[in-house]
From Swiss-Prot:
Domain of life: Archaea
Residues reported to bind substrate: 52-55, 110, 115-117, 121
UniProt miscellaneous comment: During catalysis, the active site Cys acts as a nucleophile attacking the alpha-carbonyl group of tRNA-bound glutamate with the formation of a thioester intermediate between enzyme and glutamate, and the concomitant release of tRNA(Glu). The thioester intermediate is finally reduced by direct hydride transfer from NADPH, to form the product GSA.
Family affiliation: Belongs to the glutamyl-tRNA reductase family.
Record EC number: 1.2.1.70
Catalytic activity from the UniProt record: (S)-4-amino-5-oxopentanoate + tRNA(Glu) + NADP(+) = L-glutamyl-tRNA(Glu) + NADPH + H(+)
Phylogenetic placement of the source organism: Archaea, Thermoproteota, Thermoprotei, Sulfolobales, Sulfolobaceae
Annotated protein name in UniProt: Glutamyl-tRNA reductase
Pathway connected to this protein: Porphyrin-containing compound metabolism; protoporphyrin-IX biosynthesis; 5-aminolevulinate from L-glutamyl-tRNA(Glu): step 1/2
NCBIfam families: hemA, PRK00045.4-1, PRK00045.4-2
Residues that hold NADP(+) according to the record: 190-195
Active site: 53
Quaternary structure and partners: Homodimer.
């Protein structure tokens, strides 16, 4: 492991994905809103949870002990579920954690290879957890870089060329089974996000004979009117009167048999329907992988772009550390400067000097002295941060010095030990 890679060891992730636990089991691992909020009292780290139909992934950053926070998170999951589901998690840290997120953002790790939707999901995740106060600047720079890598991969490779999204694949598979697809009678069961996307795609395809079914008929009506479609209250017994049914509703582990000749494309997790003439997400995943086989050479390019992205993140990370150092130093120095100006002016007043211009001159003079005195230090620190082998150790030491004006005894011993070791090795 290089010294630069060591900088990233504060990043870790806990992963449950369609690859490790199966698409049909993934819903058991989703976090409820109340569970997410209760984590605030437990976890002493930045964290964000990426939840999609492909994955539940927890990303953490801690500058103290990330492994300890991971153990607390896994114990919490075990307690909530009353079983050791943490044993099924894949836990990775440092470069491995970052590389995984970048591959996710690129679409290379998706159930539907190359899909675009993951980028908006990553964006909404970090925005939500920032708003909740759970993520901070270090997860922010990680997720921002992941989004940039995802966009670059799509610009410079053909991973997203053609129809790659789950919804596109679902419609294409239905079209493949019907020669006269556009004349078929179609129903969309569910007016949520998935139902809306399918309705929009069918509309763009020029399909006219579509009905929206939903538990809340008003929501079905709103979606139907948007595209000029029909709408009805949810009634699964009526599915037999349609040629094709796209299923996108939540349910409590129901399993129904397809007893009609209707082609059912079930994109719920877990699937609602079983039997003949049913296409599930797992089948669409297989189709997606077959489609990507012809573009496997793109993986070499993608991995190169991901590695470049990791190097760029290291730069982002160092830049953030340097900015934090500068801020802490200058905040301390500015407090001292302002106090000394007040003290000096009081002494001048005792001598009968009470002039606003003198105060302004003192202000300008002290600012100039600080700038000229500290610039060489800042230049050297910048060099250590971006080029030095042990940059983090030096920065933490300097921050401790300026925290209270004294060098802690423990830090002094540590620095002396390093200096002796360095001289010995030389």
């Amino acid at each position: 492991m290089t010294s630069n890679e060591e900088l990233l060891q504060n990043y870790c992730s806990i992963l449950f994905t369609y690859k490790t636990i199966g698409i049909s089991n993934l819903h058991l691992y989703y976090f409820r809103e109340t569970e997410i909020k209760s984590l605030r009292q437990l976890i002493n780290a930045e964290f964000a949870i990426l939840q999609t139909c492909n994955r539940v992934e927890i990303y953490l950053y801690s500058n103290t002990n990330t492994i300890s926070e991971i153990n607390k998170m896994i114990q919490y999951l075990n307690n909530v579920h009353n079983e050791p589901i943490g044993n099924q998690a894949r836990v990775i840290c440092g470069k491995d954690s970052i590389k995984h997120l970048f591959l996710v953002a690129s679409g290379a790790d998706s159930l539907s290879i190359g899909e675009y939707e993951i980028l908006s999901q990553i964006r909404s995740t970090i925005d939500m957890f920032k708003k909740l106060g759970f993520s901070g600047k270090y997860l922010q720079i990680l997720f921002e870089r992941a989004i940039k890598v995802g966009r670059k991969v799509r610009e410079e490779t053909s991973i997203s060329k053609g129809k790659v999204g789950i919804y596109s694949l679902a419609i294409d598979e239905a079209k493949r089974q019907f020669n006269n697809f556009y004349d078929r009678k179609i129903v969309i069961v569910g007016a949520g996000e998935m139902g809306q996307k399918i309705a929009n795609m069918l509309y763009n395809e020029g399909v006219k004979n579509v009905t929206i079914m939903n538990r809340t008929v008003e929501k079905a009506k709103q979606l139907a009117l948007k595209f000029g479609y029909n709408y009805e209250k949810l009634d699964l017994d009526k599915l037999g009167s349609f040629d094709i049914a796209f299923i996108s509703i939540s349910h409590e582990n129901l399993r129904l048999e397809n007893k009609w000749n209707t082609l059912i494309v079930d994109i719920t997790v877990p699937p609602l329907f079983t039997g003949n003439n049913v296409i599930t997400l797992e089948e669409l995943e297989k189709i997606s992988k077959l489609n990507f086989k012809a573009r496997e050479e793109e993986l070499v390019k993608i991995n190169k772009l991901v590695e470049d992205g990791i190097d760029e993140l290291i730069y982002d990370y160092k830049k953030e550390i340097y900015s934090e150092f500068m801020s802490k130093i200058m905040k301390r120095v500015e407090t001292i400067r302002e106090n000394e100006i007040v003290r000096a002016y009081k002494e001048l007043e005792k001598l009968g000097i009470n002039n606003q211009q003198v105060k302004e001159i003192l202000d300008l003079m002290t600012r100039s002295i600080i700038k000229k005195s500290f610039q060489p230090l800042f230049d050297n620190v910048r060099s250590l941060v971006f080029d030095g082998e042990n940059s983090i150790n030096y920065i933490n030491f300097l921050i401790d010095i300026f925290k209270d004006g004294n060098i802690p005894i423990f830090e002094t011993k540590k620095i002396k030990k390093k200096q002796i070791s360095k001289r010995s090795s030389s």
